Structure formats: C-alpha cells, structure tokens
Curated annotation (Swiss-Prot):
Top EC class, one word: ligase
Localisation per UniProt entry: Cytoplasm
Assembly: Homodimer. The tRNA molecule binds across the dimer.
Gene behind the chain: serS
Single GO BP term: seryl-tRNA aminoacylation
Pathway it works in: Aminoacyl-tRNA biosynthesis; selenocysteinyl-tRNA(Sec) biosynthesis; L-seryl-tRNA(Sec) from L-serine and tRNA(Sec): step 1/1
Cited InterPro entries: aa-tRNA-synt_IIb (IPR002314), aa-tRNA-synth_II (IPR006195), aa-tRNA-synth_II/BPL/LPL (IPR045864), Ser-tRNA-ligase_type_1 (IPR002317), Ser-tRNA-synth_1_N (IPR015866), SerRS_1_N_sf (IPR042103), SerRS_core (IPR033729), tRNA-bd_arm (IPR010978)
The keyword Ligase is assigned to this record: yes
Catalytic activity line of the entry: tRNA(Ser) + L-serine + ATP = L-seryl-tRNA(Ser) + AMP + diphosphate + H(+); tRNA(Sec) + L-serine + ATP = L-seryl-tRNA(Sec) + AMP + diphosphate + H(+)
The protein's name: Serine--tRNA ligase
Organism: Helicobacter pylori (strain J99 / ATCC 700824) (Campylobacter pylori J99)
Residue positions binding L-serine: 231-233, 285, 383
Length: 415
C-alpha cells in the first residue's frame, strides 16, 4: 500500500506517478481524493472538539480548585464528550473508507522503470546463450509431449476442465527432476527451502496485494475464509506478516516449491494448447525481505540465481525490463526473464523478478528494528522457475529430428 502520509501531503505527486502505468485510473484516484478530503475534514473537526474539551476541562479544574460553581461547565463537557464520541466514530469510518480506496491503488512506479504503455514498450537488457540452429523444423512442446507420451492433455480436461494437464511416465520424472534441480540451485545461492500451505486466508492475500482488487483471479474455497495460492510469494512473504525483524537478521532469503492456482480471468483464447497457461501449475519461487538500502542488489542476485538454472539447462534466454504500463499491481520495478521457444519462434516469460519496495511491507506490517526505531522492510519476489514452462523450453530446445529429447548433463543426476 502507498504511504498514506505521502498521499495526504502531496496527492498530485502520487497521482502523477500512478498515471505512468497508463491505466484508466482517473475515477479511482478521484474517489480516493474525495475520501482523503472527507477524512481530513472530519479529523480537523475532531481536533477542534478535542482542543475545546481540553480548554473547558482546564477551566473546570481551576473553578473546582477555587470552589466556584461548575455546573454550566460540567454540562458543557458532558455534551461535548457525546459529540467527541460520535465524531471519533465518524473519523474511524472515514479512515476505513480512505484505506479501502487506497488498497486498490497500485504501487508507485520506480524511477528506474522506463515509461511505456504496454509490453510492446519493454526493453531488452541482454541475451544469454545463442538459440540453436535447427536442421529441421522444430515442433511445439505439445506435439513433442504427446509423441513421447509425457503429457496427457485429454485426461486433464476429463478430470477437471480445459487448462489442466496430466504428466506421466518419463515426463513426470523430468518434471520432478527439474523441481529438485531448481531447489538445489536456490539453496546453494543462500535461499532457505520452505514448504508452506497451498491455502491461505484473506488477510494474507491482502498483504501481498492480490486482494481486494483481483478477487476474480484466485480460487476461493466455498463457505471458508480460504483461497488457493496463486504463487508462493503469498505464503513466503506473509510468514513475516505483522512481524518486527531485527536488522541483524536481514536479508531473509526463502525458496519454495508449490502448486499454484489461477483462474486466468481475462485470458480466454490465449495459449489454449499446451502447458503455457494453466489453471494449476508448479513453480519454484524466490522471496527476499531486505533492508531498503539492499533491495536493488537483491533484485540482481535473484535474477542471476534464476538465470543460473537456465544456463545449466542450456536454455537460451534474455532479461527484459518491464515498462511502467506492464508492471504488476504490487511491483515498483520488474525485470522478466524470457526463455527462447524454437517451436513458437519467440521468447516467452519464465520468470518475473519484482521489487515491491515497501508496498507489500506496509500492507502486511513487516518491519525491522534499527537504532531502536521500527521501519518498513523491502520485499522482492520472483520465479526460479516456473516448472511447466521450463519443461516446455527443455522439450523445444533439446528436441531431436526424431522427436526424442536430449537431457542436459545438469539434469542427468536427478533422473
């Protein structure tokens, strides 16, 4: 959540930053402006009544000490106290309304994030490994998966509906091996392996920014205050929800393998074949909680950690700086890693490493103590990596003319 003090002091500066996202936010910002104005008005009235109460109380005390008649002052104090209680309640309600309006406003755009309207304006930073020159026309992953009997798309539809898959046989062994390899690499780079619940309550999803704005994107358990996690970012970050961390314990680096569940609202017609876009998928996530001065360096570290896995699997990829119009809700700055898919003849996102600055920390009340003062941490998250998409990239990049798949040396020991 954006700093309320900043909004109260300089609303226009905040609005200018948010408009860099190129979203139609005028209505939301106007409603927030009105809520802030109402809160300020109520607060000023309350402070006026409190000042009056203090003044009359002082007069009452003086007259009492002088044994003078205080009946009028007593009545005035009683009447004012009733007004104070009513106005205090109104101020509390106005504050809640302001915070509700504020909770659906995305993070401020980082100064390092380039301006742009959409993914078309994202900027390539660098390429790593050169795509292979094929002597035959490369197939897409779903053709290879079916040919090798690794992925059963029809059974996924039968068991659930579209955008679900069944992985079996040697394909399942590769899938499992990829998870183990990713966790081992992440652990080697200093990230603690953690297994968390796949269900969380509403407060946790608020903390990382999925709720209340993106309720349609997550699966809710009927008649329960529980949701299936869209990413382990939610559980790992919220392990420290409402926590004060000693500065000596920063940074905190965590990794987790979890199933992830997304409704993919608004994705109708996109990537309808194969494993690129699924309602349920596995992901190995990185989350870091850092001192504000260290978050930029941590973002680079997380990117290199994810890239290291792709290099070990001999998968060409590139770093892409997201522009302001393509940022996620909680992100202030994001760099994607896109992997080359020869079957599609294009790069596709396989990791997204975001620095949310203190946006999530403010929502989730994650603080650190330094010099006897509590301050907000910075939180970062990123995939390392999306398992299904990594398997897709492995199949397409390492396919042979006969449809068989070459196994990279780094993966052999896990099979």
């Amino acid at each position: 959540m954006i700093d309320r003090k900043l909004l109260l002091q300089d609303f226009d500066k905040v609005a200018l930053s948010l408009k860099k996202r190129n979203h139609a936010m005028d209505d939301e910002l106007e409603r927030l402006r009105e809520a802030i104005a109402h809160y300020k008005k109520q607060l000023i009235e309350l402070e006026g009544l409190q000042a009056f109460q203090n003044k009359v109380s002082k007069e009452f005390g003086i007259k009492m000490a002088q044994k003078m008649d205080t009946s009028d002052l007593k009545k005035e104090l009683e009447n004012n106290k009733i007004k104070l209680n009513e106005l205090s309640k109104s101020v509390g309600e106005a504050e809640q309304e302001m915070d509700l309006k504020l909770s659906i406003i995305p993070n401020l755009v980082d100064e390092k994030t380039p301006l742009g309207a959409s993914e078309e304006d994202n900027i390539e930073i660098k390429k790593i490994l050169t795509p292979r020159n094929f002597t035959f026309k490369p197939k897409e992953h779903f053709e290879l998966a079916q040919q090798n009997g690794w992925i059963d798309f029809e059974s996924g539809v039968k068991l659930a509906k579209s955008r679900f898959s069944v992985i079996r046989g040697f394909g399942a062994k590769i899938y499992r091996a990829l998870i183990h390899l990713m966790l081992d690499f992440n652990e080697k780079n200093g990230f603690e392996i953690i297994y968390t619940p796949a269900l969380v309550n509403e407060k946790m999803l608020f903390g990382t920014g999925q709720l209340p704005k993106f309720k349609e994107d997550v699966f809710k358990i009927e008649n329960e205050n529980l949701y299936l996690i869209p990413t382990a970012e939610v559980t790992l970050t919220n392990l420290y929800n409402d926590t004060i961390i000693s500065v000596e314990n920063l940074p905190i680096k965590m990794t987790a393998h979890t199933p992830c569940f997304r409704s993919e609202a608004g994705s109708a017609g996109k990537d309808t074949r194969g494993m690129i876009r699924q309602h349920q998928f596995d992901k190995v996530e990185l989350v870091a909680i850092t001192h504000p001065k260290e978050s930029d360096a941590m973002q680079e570290h997380m990117l290199e950690s994810a890239s290291e896995i792709l290099k070990a699997l001999e998968l060409p990829h590139r770093f892409v700086q997201l522009c302001s119009g393509d940022l996620g809700f909680s992100a202030s700055n994001t760099i994607d890693i896109e992997v080359w898919l020869p079957g599609q003849n294009c790069y596709r996102e396989i990791s997204s490493v975001s620095n949310t600055r203190d946006f999530q920390a403010r929502r989730a009340k994650i603080r650190f103590k330094e010099n006897q003062k509590n301050q907000l941490v910075h939180t970062l998250n990123g995939s390392s990596l999306a398992v299904g998409r990594t398997m897709v990239a492995l199949m397409e990049n390492h396919q042979q003319a006969d449809g068989s798949i070459h196994i990279p040396k780094a993966l052999e020991k896990y099979l």
